[in-house]
C-alpha cells in the first residue's frame, strides 16, 4: 500500500505544530467537524499537508473557484511529488445549459465546449481514488454535481493480464461498451487501434501514455506502455486495467433495463399530457425520447445521456445523484478551504438548477427523471461528508457552530505581522492612491486596489494608465488561464498595480504586494462586511511592510470590527516575535513553479513538448503505413519550422529521419 510522503525543507513553526497536533488528535478520536481558523500567510496549506501526512487518509480538498483550486493543486503537487495529487473541476470552457423560456416560447439547446485536458484529469481523479489510498483530489463545486454511478463504473473495467485468454475481438467489443472508439487514423484519447494482432489503447484518463496489448491467437502475449505519439516502448507490464472513457457507462444488460424504464416513464408522461390536453407537449416528449432510445440502442449513449443518470444508476426518484463524494472511501478526509465562501456556494446550486429543469419537464422537453440529474442539496451534501476540516481566516457561524474543535493559527512561521491599517477620506482616494502607488514603486512593491463596480475598475485603470502607471485589471469577464497569468505577471513585475473587485480576496498568494487600497470602504454590504474586509486586508499580510489604506468618510461597524481584529492579531504576533527574538521577513515563493504546475499551464507545456517527441521519434516503433504517414507529416512540419528559424542543422537531421521512414514504409 502506497503511503503519503511529505517532501519539504521546513519544519512546522509558529502556531503550526499545535494546530497540526490538535487536528490530528481530533481525527484520531473520531471528531466529525473541526475548524482551522488560520490568519492569511500562517501556512494553512502546509498545516493541511502535515495533517494528511500524519493521518494517512485519502483527501478531498474543496475550493470555491478554479484559480484557488489551481493554486492548491500546484502546492500539494510540490508537497507530495510521489503521491497521486489530482484535479477535479468543471471541464467546460463554455457552457450554455439546455433551457426553455415559456414567455417567448424559446427553446435553447445545450451548447458547450469541453476542455479535453480537464476531462482527462477528472477521469484520472476518479481512477486514482478507486485504485489507491495515497490520493489528494482538489475539486470545486463540480464535486457535488451528478456523475456516473461508481458501482456501474467499476463493473465496466477491462482487466488485462499476460497469459490470459481474452481474444482480440472480445477486447474490442468490451472497449466499445466502455465508450472507446476505434480509430486507426487518428490515435487520440478515448480511442483504440488494431494492427494485425496488436491492440493499442489510449486510456481516457491518460495524458500521453498508451497501452499496447500483443496477442498470440486469443492469448495476451505482452503488455507495454508506449508513447502515444511516437509509439516508443516505455516499459513492460504484467497486468493493466483500462477504465471507461466516460463516467456515464453501464453494462449491456443494464442498458436494456434502462431502455425499458425510459419507455415506461415515457408512456406515463404522454398519457399525463394527453389527459391535460397538452397535445404539443405529448408529441414533443414522445419524439425526443424515442430518438434518445434509438441512439442508446445503436451507439450505447445519446446526447444528454446524463439526464437519464438516475435510471442508469437504478436509484429511486428523489434520491441524491452519485457524485465525486460517492467515489471516496469511508476513511476519507474532506478539507473545505475558504469555507466561509465555499459552503454558501455549494448550498446555492440546487435551486438554480431545479428552476431551469422544471420548465424543460413541464413543457415536454425532458422526462421527470431528468430532475434527478442535479447537484446535491445542501443537507444531502452534509450527510455524505466524512470527517471534515473547515479552513478559513474568517469562518462563518455555520462552521463554528458545527465545530467540535476550533484550532487557531495566528502566529506565522515567518514572524510576519498583520498589516497596519489606516483610514483616509473618500474625497482624496484617487489622488492619494496615485501618491501611494508612486511610493510603492520606488520600493519595488506591488499594489492592489479594490473597488465596488466593474465600471469603476475600468475607469480607474484608464486614469492610472494615463498618469504613467503600469496597471492591469481583474474581474469576472477574464477567464481562468488569463487570471493565473495576470497574477503571475504582477508578481514578476511585468506591471505594478492590479485593480479588481472581489477577485483579490481569498487564497491568492502574492507576497510581493506591499500596499492595499480599499476604495469606498464605508459602503456597508457584501464586499465591505467585516469578514470581507479582514480577508481583503489579508492580501498584504505576506509582506513585511504590508499596509492597508481604507478610504471612508465614516468608520462603519464592519470596518471597526475588522480593524480591531487585525490589531488584536498584530499584538499577539508582535509579543510572540519579541519573546522568541524573531525578525519578520517576507518569504517569496518560486513564481514559475506555482504557474507551471497549474493544470492549465501544464497543458500549454505539454503542447510545446510535443515537438521534442517528434524530433526523437523511434522509426523501429512505427506500426504500419498509416502511422508512418502521420509521423512524416509531423516531421515535415518540424523541418519547415526549423528552416524558418534558420536552424538548418536541426532541419537536416529531421529531413534524414523523414527519408528513413519513407525508405522503410513507402519505398521512395
Swiss-Prot record:
Stretches assigned to the Helicase ATP-binding domain: 25-413
Quaternary structure, from the entry: Forms a heterotetramer with UvrA during the search for lesions. Interacts with UvrC in an incision complex.
PANTHER family hit by this protein: UVRABC SYSTEM PROTEIN B (PTHR24029:SF0)
Gene Ontology BP term (one): SOS response
GO cellular component: cytoplasm; excinuclease repair complex
Biological classification of the source: Bacteria, Pseudomonadati, Pseudomonadota, Gammaproteobacteria, Thiotrichales
Entry's Gene Ontology molecular function annotations: ATP binding; ATP hydrolysis activity; DNA binding; excinuclease ABC activity
SUPFAM superfamilies for the chain: C-terminal UvrC-binding domain of UvrB, P-loop containing nucleoside triphosphate hydrolases
SMART domains linked: DEXDc (SM00487), HELICc (SM00490)
Protein name: UvrABC system protein B
Function: The UvrABC repair system catalyzes the recognition and processing of DNA lesions. A damage recognition complex composed of 2 UvrA and 2 UvrB subunits scans DNA for abnormalities. Upon binding of the UvrA(2)B(2) complex to a putative damaged site, the DNA wraps around one UvrB monomer. DNA wrap is dependent on ATP binding by UvrB and probably causes local melting of the DNA helix, facilitating insertion of UvrB beta-hairpin between the DNA strands. Then UvrB probes one DNA strand for the presence of a lesion.
Organism: Francisella tularensis subsp. tularensis (strain SCHU S4 / Schu 4)
Pfam families per UniProt: Helicase_C (PF00271), ResIII (PF04851), UVR (PF02151), UvrB (PF12344), UvrB_inter (PF17757)
Main localization of the protein described in the UniProt heading: cytoplasm
